[in-house]
Curated annotation (Swiss-Prot):
Its EC number is 2.7.7.2. InterPro entries: Archaeal_FAD_synthase, Cyt_trans-like, FAD_synth_RibL, Rossmann-like_a/b/a_fold. It holds the Pfam family CTP_transf_like. It comes from Methanothermobacter thermautotrophicus (strain ATCC 29096 / DSM 1053 / JCM 10044 / NBRC 100330 / Delta H). Catalyzes the transfer of the AMP portion of ATP to flavin mononucleotide (FMN) to produce flavin adenine dinucleotide (FAD) coenzyme. This is FAD synthase. ATP binds at residues 9-10, 14-17, 96, 123. The gene is ribL. Disulfide bonds: none annotated. Homodimer. Its cofactor is a divalent metal cation.
Length: 151
C-alpha cells in the first residue's frame, strides 16, 4: 500500500479541494492511503492571508472528507518534520501552491526522504473553484438585515 501525502490550507472547502484530494489519492493506486497535512493558521497568515476558518475546524472538516484516511496539522517551524513522521511514497502538491517541484524534490533528498513529488492540475469545472474567488464573491454582494436575520 502506498501512502500519498497531500498538503494545503483547505479554507472554505470547495470543489477544487475535493478534486485535489481525489486526484492525490489516485496517485497511490487502488489501495492508497491518503494523509492530508493542513497548514497552521500562523503559516497561512505569513504566506497568504488570515484564514477565514481556524485550523482546528479546517482539520475537523478535512477529516470528514471521503478520500481522506488521516489528517494532521503541520508544523509551525519545519514543514519537513511531519514528512519524516508520515514517510509518504508520494507528495501531492496543489496547483496554487508556490512550491517548485524540482526544488522540493531536491530538499527532500537532502533530508533523506526519497518520495516522489507530483503537482495536481487545477479543477476547472466550477465557477467558484478557489477560496479567493469565494471571498471576492461574498465581498461583492450586498446584504440587508432581512437577508441576514437567520444567520
Amino acid at each position: 500500500m502506498k501512502t500519498v501525502m497531500a498538503t494545503g490550507t483547505f479554507d472554505i472547502i470547495h470543489p477544487g479541494h475535493g478534486f485535489f484530494l481525489e486526484e492525490a489519492r489516485k496517485l497511490g493506486g487502488e489501495d492508497a492511503r491518503l494523509v492530508v497535512v493542513l497548514a497552521r493558521d500562523s503559516t497561512v497568515r505569513a504566506r497568504k492571508r488570515t484564514p477565514i476558518v481556524g485550523e482546528k475546524q479546517r482539520l475537523e472538516v478535512v477529516r470528514m472528507l471521503k478520500p481522506v484516511d488521516e489528517a494532521y496539522l503541520g508544523s509551525e517551524t519545519d514543514m519537513f518534520e511531519i514528512v519524516h513522521r508520515i514517510k509518504p511514497d508520494i507528495i501531492a502538491i496543489g496547483p496554487d501552491q508556490k512550491f517548485d517541484v524540482d526544488e522540493l524534490r531536491d530538499e527532500l533528498r537532502r533530508r533523506g526522504l526519497g518520495c516522489e513529488v507530483r503537482r495536481i492540475e487545477k479543477y476547472r469545472d466550477a465557477e467558484l473553484d478557489s477560496t479567493c474567488k469565494i471571498i471576492k464573491r461574498i465581498r461583492s454582494m450586498e446584504f440587508d438585515e432581512d437577508s441576514l436575520k437567520n444567520c
